[in-house]
Amino acid sequence: MTMSIRIGNGYDIHRLVSDRALILGGVHIPHELGLLGHSDADVLTHAIMDAMLGALSLGDIGHYFPPTDPQWAGADSLVLLSQVNELIRTQGWRIGNIDSVVVAERPKLKPHIKTMRDKLADILQLEPNQIGVKATTNEKLGPVGREEGICAYAVVLLVSSDEIS
């Protein structure tokens, strides 16, 4: 059975450490801590990529950009996102919309949301109103609440290119 829409969800979490930049949605966020990871550790962009891949049963970002491969060390996650977007397009799909949430106790993310949406929209060839980015805290619960890390969740709706034509 061929379906004209697909939905995927994604999640990512990285540890907060000193001496790293905090990048979310491709935006450098001023903060005394940054996220530790093989690439730039952009949890929002990683969650979106996993949702895109999951919607088409194409695995996860670790399959395409393994953390054991030195070629991806320090990689800009927006470059990886562009590659994932090209992959789903070659499979005959386009993004209908994205909804996401970043969970962090600090810093306050609201002032950066529009810039994140605009950057993601540019990379994904979408209108900013097709991308929802929200921020919340974990009410001081768990590792995110203790400010040990930041996590993000994303849901992506893919639409068959045949439906768009």
Swiss-Prot record:
<dbReference type="GO" id="GO:0019288">
    <property type="term" value="P:isopentenyl diphosphate biosynthetic process, methylerythritol 4-phosphate pathway"/>
</dbReference>
<feature type="binding site">
    <location>
        <begin position="60"/>
        <end position="62"/>
    </location>
    <ligand>
        <name>4-CDP-2-C-methyl-D-erythritol 2-phosphate</name>
    </ligand>
</feature>
<feature type="binding site">
    <location>
        <begin position="12"/>
        <end position="14"/>
    </location>
    <ligand>
        <name>4-CDP-2-C-methyl-D-erythritol 2-phosphate</name>
    </ligand>
</feature>
<dbReference type="InterPro" id="IPR036571">
    <property type="entry name" value="MECDP_synthase_sf"/>
</dbReference>
<keyword id="KW-0414">Isoprene biosynthesis</keyword>
<keyword id="KW-0456">Lyase</keyword>
<feature type="site" description="Transition state stabilizer">
    <location>
        <position position="38"/>
    </location>
</feature>
<dbReference type="GO" id="GO:0008685">
    <property type="term" value="F:2-C-methyl-D-erythritol 2,4-cyclodiphosphate synthase activity"/>
</dbReference>
<dbReference type="GO" id="GO:0046872">
    <property type="term" value="F:metal ion binding"/>
</dbReference>
<comment type="similarity">
    <text>Belongs to the IspF family.</text>
</comment>
<feature type="binding site">
    <location>
        <position position="14"/>
    </location>
    <ligand>
        <name>a divalent metal cation</name>
    </ligand>
</feature>
<dbReference type="Pfam" id="PF02542">
    <property type="entry name" value="YgbB"/>
</dbReference>
<feature type="site" description="Transition state stabilizer">
    <location>
        <position position="137"/>
    </location>
</feature>
<feature type="binding site">
    <location>
        <begin position="38"/>
        <end position="39"/>
    </location>
    <ligand>
        <name>4-CDP-2-C-methyl-D-erythritol 2-phosphate</name>
    </ligand>
</feature>
<feature type="binding site">
    <location>
        <position position="12"/>
    </location>
    <ligand>
        <name>a divalent metal cation</name>
    </ligand>
</feature>
<feature type="binding site">
    <location>
        <position position="46"/>
    </location>
    <ligand>
        <name>a divalent metal cation</name>
    </ligand>
</feature>
<comment type="function">
    <text>Involved in the biosynthesis of isopentenyl diphosphate (IPP) and dimethylallyl diphosphate (DMAPP), two major building blocks of isoprenoid compounds. Catalyzes the conversion of 4-diphosphocytidyl-2-C-methyl-D-erythritol 2-phosphate (CDP-ME2P) to 2-C-methyl-D-erythritol 2,4-cyclodiphosphate (ME-CPP) with a corresponding release of cytidine 5-monophosphate (CMP).</text>
</comment>
<comment type="subunit">
    <text>Homotrimer.</text>
</comment>
<keyword id="KW-0479">Metal-binding</keyword>
<dbReference type="InterPro" id="IPR003526">
    <property type="entry name" value="MECDP_synthase"/>
</dbReference>
<feature type="binding site">
    <location>
        <position position="146"/>
    </location>
    <ligand>
        <name>4-CDP-2-C-methyl-D-erythritol 2-phosphate</name>
    </ligand>
</feature>
<dbReference type="InterPro" id="IPR020555">
    <property type="entry name" value="MECDP_synthase_CS"/>
</dbReference>
<protein>
    <recommendedName>
        <fullName>2-C-methyl-D-erythritol 2,4-cyclodiphosphate synthase</fullName>
        <ecNumber>4.6.1.12</ecNumber>
    </recommendedName>
</protein>
<feature type="binding site">
    <location>
        <begin position="136"/>
        <end position="139"/>
    </location>
    <ligand>
        <name>4-CDP-2-C-methyl-D-erythritol 2-phosphate</name>
    </ligand>
</feature>
<dbReference type="GO" id="GO:0016114">
    <property type="term" value="P:terpenoid biosynthetic process"/>
</dbReference>
<comment type="pathway">
    <text>Isoprenoid biosynthesis; isopentenyl diphosphate biosynthesis via DXP pathway; isopentenyl diphosphate from 1-deoxy-D-xylulose 5-phosphate: step 4/6.</text>
</comment>
